[in-house]
């Protein structure tokens, strides 16, 4: 088992823009500063602990009894905690400003050292998977203390048919700091550094602020933002195509060596879900496109008084919706009250995120786009990142990410190995938190118009959560299959993506094509997890990663769970 580093299930003086005092992270619970003596101490201890672990256990795993194996597991968890703490600090600090060269260097240096120190541990999963099945079953049936770890090792043993020789696995571990990791970092830094000049706006905007304009009530503002996005993406499309081609080819090579039957296999194993389940969900959702997304967007066109929607109309508010900015204090109260209405303990678990610097909410130049909840390590606490702009969907995103955060806090007592959860299950926790907030808002609606606005927003979020994610899943599967046949041009990528979105949205009669669709590829930024020592990857990575949103939404679907995703 290689070290499983925690991953996020994204100028400190930026203005809150009338939203109230937006919080920023206080990372001192991890380390006080990049040059903190505690960080240097932990790096030295990590190097020593890894070397000692390999010296004590390599070649001996099959001989350990239950007591000896339990001690081995506990030592491995301690190493995971050390490495995870270091990389969590470096990664979170980087995502606050991905365009800062010093932060990027610090992250890369930490990643290089952690990778070097943990290379001796590559033997662990390889040797463990060679233990005979009967001996393995007996070992994990010996007592309750070791039996509780069996689910984690069952997932590890699922990789047994696909593991390579010890030497090749060590090479891949060493090589992980470049290749996909470097390409993902290039993609991240490029996206964070983009600037958009939108006619009518007083200054150039970053990606999050420009995307935010696509949900403005004034149609000319939405159209201007869409054209600005398309123009900037056009100037970068060759780079984005190169990133996608390279990552897809690298994955094809590794899958071929591992003899994985499909590009999706690795992701299904990671998500601990059977391929048949994924295929059944995919087929059911695709069959329902006409009844769901096609129907809804045709209805929305009617509400907006349009014969046909354009791309920039997809996230437009309804005409009767009041335009207002939701301040941070109101967003906090809304989410915490919603959580408390379900269980006071849930609100108690969420409250420290607001009070102790566990949330970074402001939109700033260089800050990574999107939102995430990062578990860090079980002996510290999670951190939540948002790009909060005061829209109703931003409140839902806050509720969603705090659902992750509460789940991560509840899981922490299980320890490093057992606190980690498949992404499909993780998304169930987050959409549950989001749904609590929606149901409370719906219960408080006093007029039919308020209810209509809330329900329409929930339908759109459900389309984004389940239906749209399946369309992206299909696109990723087709992308990887096509890349096996040769290099893909930007036009090849556009055609495949456009076909998937046409099926999803029902371009006729609801939508007209627009050049933004041909460039939508570069916004698919949550599809890989090889990047940054598995901290976060957002270029064209593993098909199936987006499936976790659809699965989470499906589980909560009877209550209308959702995942608010950016356009």
Description of each model-found segment:
Residues 324-326, 359-381:
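Catalytic zinc-binding patch centered on the HExxH motif and its immediate surroundings
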Residues 328-358:
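Amphipathic alpha-helical domain-onset/packing element
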């Amino acid at each position: 088992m290689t070290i499983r580093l925690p991953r996020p299930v994204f100028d400190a003086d930026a203005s809150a823009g009338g939203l109230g005092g937006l919080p920023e992270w206080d990372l001192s619970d991890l380390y006080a500063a990049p040059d903190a003596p505690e960080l240097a101490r932990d790096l030295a201890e990590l190097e020593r602990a890894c070397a000692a672990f390999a010296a004590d256990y390599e070649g001996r795993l099959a001989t350990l009894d239950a007591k000896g194996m339990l001690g081995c597991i506990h030592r491995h968890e301690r190493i995971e905690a050390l490495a995870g703490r270091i990389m969590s600090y470096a990664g979170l600090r980087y995502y606050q400003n991905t365009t800062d060269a010093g932060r990027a260097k610090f992250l890369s240096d930490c990643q290089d050292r952690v990778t070097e120190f943990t290379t001796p541990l590559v033997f662990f999963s390889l040797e463990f998977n060679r233990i005979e099945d009967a001996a393995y079953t007996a070992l994990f049936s010996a007592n309750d203390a070791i039996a509780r770890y069996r689910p984690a090792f069952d997932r590890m043993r699922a990789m047994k048919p696909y593991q390579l020789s010890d030497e090749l696995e060590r090479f891949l571990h060493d090589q992980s700091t470049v290749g996909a990791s470097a390409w993902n970092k290039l993609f991240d830094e490029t996206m964070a550094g983009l600037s958009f000049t939108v006619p009518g706006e007083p200054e150039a905007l970053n990606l999050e602020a420009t995307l935010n304009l696509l949900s403005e009530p004034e149609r000319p503002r939405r159209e201007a933002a869409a054209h600005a996005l398309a123009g900037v993406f056009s100037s970068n499309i060759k780079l984005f195509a190169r990133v996608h081609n390279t990552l897809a080819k690298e994955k094809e090579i590794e899958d071929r060596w591992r003899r994985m039957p499909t590009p999706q296999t690795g992701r299904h194993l990671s998500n601990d879900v059977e391929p048949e389940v994924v295929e059944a969900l995919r087929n059911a959702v695709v069959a329902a496109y006409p009844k769901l997304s096609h129907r809804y967007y045709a209805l929305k066109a009617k509400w907006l008084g349009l014969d046909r929607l354009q791309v920039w109309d997809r996230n437009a508010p309804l005409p009767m919706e009041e335009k207002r900015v939701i301040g941070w204090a109101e967003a906090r109260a809304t989410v915490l009250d919603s959580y408390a209405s379900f269980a006071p303990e849930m609100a108690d678990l969420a409250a420290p995120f607001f009070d102790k610097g566990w949330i970074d909410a402001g939109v700033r130049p260089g800050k990574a786009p999107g939102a995430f909840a990062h578990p860090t390590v079980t002996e510290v606490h999670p951190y939540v990142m948002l790009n909060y702009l005061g829209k109703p969907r931003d409140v839902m995103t806050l509720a969603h990410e705090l659902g992750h955060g509460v789940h991560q806090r509840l899981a922490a007592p299980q320890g490093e190995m057992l606190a980690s959860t498949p992404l499909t299950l993780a998304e169930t926790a987050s959409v549950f938190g989001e749904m609590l907030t929606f149901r409370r808002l719906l219960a408080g609606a006093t007029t039919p118009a308020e209810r209509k606005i809330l329900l329409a927003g929930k339908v759109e979020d459900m389309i984004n959560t389940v239906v749209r994610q399946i369309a992206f899943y299909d696109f990723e599967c087709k992308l990887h299959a096509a890349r096996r046949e040769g290099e893909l041009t930007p036009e090849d990528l556009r055609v495949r993506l456009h076909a998937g979105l046409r099926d999803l949205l029902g371009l006729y009669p609801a939508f007209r094509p627009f050049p933004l669709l041909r460039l939508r590829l570069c916004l698919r930024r949550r599809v890989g997890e090889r990047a940054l020592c598995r901290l976060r990857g957002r270029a064209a990575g593993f098909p199936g990663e987006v499936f976790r949103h659809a699965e989470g939404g499906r589980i909560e679907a009877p209550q209308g769970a959702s995942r608010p995703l950016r356009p």
